[in-house]
């Protein structure tokens, strides 16, 4: 049976290639998820301190590990409800917290010398909007996917990339000096995504 693009995306193929040698060892998917939590926590800490390069590199690593735990679970047959929830909570929580951390880090820089001419307090609001919007979108997406087939997602990918691969940009863009622009974009895109997914859910319920 064919599976959707997300299973065959480049990043998931890379994840399977990297962790296939560990099959049969004591490594479990939950170990990988725990490492992903640690990397994401460290990334948020560096973003909060204003170290965008260190934070960005750690975030890219955590995003890759987020693909690896699920692929390793499928390869080894070690999938579990606890592991699924462990991974899901990390996805939703960290995808929101990272923008709040970026907002705090940029606000400190703004207080010291200004960033794009926007005061530090406003950056806190922008970070809150981005983090809250992305968090809500993640929760609504998970609700929307309940009852869908295992290979179906709220948003589909294209050209060898799945929608979740946008998470890599959260690390790459700050490394290139674009954290303020990323945050502004997320403060618009996050709430907008939540509205779009919420509308999908509303249509589903009205159709029932």
Regions inferred by a protein language model and the residue ranges of each:
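Alpha-helical transmembrane segments of multipass membrane proteins
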Residues: 21, 38-45, 169-172
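Membrane-interface alpha-helices at helix entry/exit sites of multi-pass transporters
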Residues: 81-89
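Transmembrane helix-loop junction
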Residues: 24, 74-75, 104-108
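A feature for the membrane-embedded catalytic helix bundles of lipid/isoprenoid biosynthetic enzymes
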Residues: 1-19, 88-208
């Amino acid at each position: 049976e064919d599976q959707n693009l997300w299973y065959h995306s480049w990043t998931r193929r890379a994840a399977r290639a990297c962790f296939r040698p560990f099959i049969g060892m004591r490594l479990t998917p939950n170990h990988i998820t725990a490492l992903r939590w640690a990397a994401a926590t460290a990334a948020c800490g560096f973003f909060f301190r204003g170290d965008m390069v260190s934070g960005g590199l750690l975030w890219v690593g955590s995003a890759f590990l987020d693909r690896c735990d699920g692929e390793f679970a499928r390869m080894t047959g070690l999938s579990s409800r606890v592991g699924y929830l462990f991974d899901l909570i990390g996805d939703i929580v960290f995808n929101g917290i990272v923008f709040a951390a970026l907002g705090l880090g940029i606000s400190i820089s703004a207080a010291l010398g200004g960033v794009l001419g926007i005061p530090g307090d406003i950056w806190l609001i922008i970070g809150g909007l981005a983090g809250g919007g992305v968090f809500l979108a993640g929760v609504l997406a998970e609700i929307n996917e309940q009852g869908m087939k295992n290979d179906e997602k709220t948003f589909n990918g294209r050209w060898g990339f799945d929608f979740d691969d946008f998470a890599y940009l959260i690390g790459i863009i700050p490394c290139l000096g674009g954290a303020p622009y990323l945050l502004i974009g997320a403060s618009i895109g996050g709430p907008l995504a939540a509205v779009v997914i919420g509308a999908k859910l509303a249509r589903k319920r009205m159709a029932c």
